[in-house]
């Protein structure tokens, strides 16, 4: 924050001797003689105008202006007078005030943050991209002050904000590239201007993709949105990123994870209203099967299945030499089957229903073996049983004449069919659509409605569906069921907590406990429900515990509203026992 004193401008070591300036002035005169130089009087006037502006001595361009002024024959006395008279010492005053604050006991770091944040807000408010570009052009090279600024997190953050606000500013675009060159590309994912420069974008893409892969499933929810937003910045960024991920997806090691990320990005684009289906098909194997590609593309673009295109695919996938199964393993395409086959009230042409079921079952169950880009075998062992399970559950789910009591009689059949992953996904979607109806819980008399009981079975059989089950339970838990009275709402929420505890018992521990911890911290959940959850969890767990679990769960028990309020039977006190076990076996991190 220190600034230069006025007298420093005449330092001979910095500017060179008067003779050197004179030589340069002669050179300038020769340039004038050739008709290419500027008029000396105009140059002097322009320079004097700059010298008369406030604190011009602090400007980075002061040295070049002085040089031009003296080359044009300007008088040193005028310079000294103007610079001195217009020196108001804004920077030095800030330094002085900062020193006073520190002397009064304010932490130096806090003072620095205050000054920097105020300066950032002023720069964002008054930034002029045209002026920035002109200064940048005049410099002719990367200014030293810019290289110094990008070395600091605070000022990099400023450049990111400015670049978002002024995407066409050349100076900011260049600065973003400089930041990327300096190795900070991991910070640039949210900067849209980075998407305009291939070199920067490819570097940021590589870093972001590596971060997502290293972070694994548990960090996907945190890392993916920013990445998807960057990739979906424009058609060019989407195509480039998906093409690169398509190549990486062919790798034996980590290829499937990259394919998953590519599919999540495609879903993000679809949710934002972009139709990227043609790019998806072009990068897959569809290009070799133009008729199938046309049928798929039509349905994906419209967001709905239709009998004509389904018939085309059905004929191809029941032929002696069907296309690769990968062709129909497009998540957006499979989602359309969920809506057609499992959504309550969905109408499907009975003459074509078997075709819909066959294609979905084929995509879900057929296993192909490939060697050197050539298919050597197709295993259809599970195709028939999968088709049968899909058809059975479809008939149960979409039969509007079957109420909850009739479904109870079919529970054993449903449980058998749920063992097939594709059916479990369909049932999960069906349960979501059904229980999201406003009057659903109002009409239920059972303590545990059959639809929620099905979620327990899905949690038991399919670890990969745990996140979706929890997502549904959280949605229901946070929904305001105003049609129920207060006691009925509490009972319903206890039932939902029972489902969460079951999910925890099936191995999905940290996400469930994390959610309840957030409920406690946000103070928006009836404390009796938190106590109920704690009691139920303590009933199903036993040592040894992982450190991550203890770090999440112990603070819930130690909360003033929880500790000492849970009733115990006899001498057995699970809360005290758990706390004592943790204190003696773990070091808690605040």
From Swiss-Prot:
Segments for region (Disordered): 15-43
GO terms, biological process: negative regulation of transcription elongation by RNA polymerase II
GO cellular component: NELF complex
Keyword entries, A-Z: Nucleus, Repressor, RNA-binding, Transcription, Transcription regulation
InterPro entries: TH1 (IPR006942)
Gene Ontology terms for molecular function: RNA binding
Compositional bias segments (type: Acidic residues): 21-43
Subcellular location: Nucleus
Main localization of the protein described in the UniProt heading: nucleus
Family: Belongs to the NELF-D family.
Function of the protein: Essential component of the NELF complex, a complex that negatively regulates the elongation of transcription by RNA polymerase II. The NELF complex, which acts via an association with the DSIF complex and causes transcriptional pausing, is counteracted by the P-TEFb kinase complex.
Name the record gives this protein: Negative elongation factor D
Species: Pongo abelii (Sumatran orangutan)
